[in-house]
Amino acid sequence: MNVKEFSTVSSTNDTVPRILVVGGGYAGFYTAWKLEKHLRRGEAEVTIVDPLPYMTYQPFLPEVAAGSIEARHAVVALRRHLKRTNVLTAKVTGIDHANKVATITPPVGEPFQQEYDQIVVTAGSVSRTFPIPGIADNAIGLKTIEEAVAIRDRLMSNFDKAALLPPGPERDRLLTVVVVGGGFAGIEVFAELRSLASALL
C-alpha cells in the first residue's frame, strides 16, 4: 500500500507517544481503560478503533439469547467509560508497521491513515462455520449482541408457529435446536435455551 494514497491523521502533540488499540472488545477495552488508569493526563495519546461503539461482554451472550437478561446489560459503551481515549467507530483495514501507519475506514467517508508509535492488535474473532453442509447458510453465530438477539427472536418465532400446529414433523422441526460446538459458549447456550424451552412449553 502506498502511504501517500490517503490523508494522514497525526497526533496533535508530537511529543507524546501515540498508542493505537485495534479492536474494542474485552481485551481492547481493558487495554485502553488500564492505560487511562496508569498514565497521567498528557503522557500518551490513546486511540481505540472498532466498528461498534461498545464492548460486548461475551460470557453474557447465552443469557441474552435465552432472554434471561436484556441485551443492554451485556454491553459497555466505549465513549462513556473511556474519557481520555480517542474512540473511532470504524475499521482498521490495513497496517503498515514498517512506517507505523494504520489505514482506517469509517462507515461514511474516505479511508484515512492514523500514525502510531505503539500498536495493540485485539481485533477479536468471528464464528467458525466448519466444513459442515448447511452451517454457513442456516446457523447463527454467538459472538455479538446482534447474533444473540437473532437467536432469541428465531426461537420465539418458532415457538409461536409451533403452538398453532398439531404434533407432527413440521412442529418437531420448529421445536428442534442444534448447538454446534461443545465449548463454554455451546454448553452455556444449550443450558439457557433448555431452560427457556421448559418455561415456554
For each feature predicted by the language model, list its residue ranges.
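FAD-binding core/adjacent interface of flavoenzyme oxidoreductases
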Residues: N2-V16, N86-V178, L196
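Beta1-alpha1 glycine-rich phosphate/pyrophosphate-binding loop at the start
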Residues: N2-T89, T93, V177-V178, F184-L201
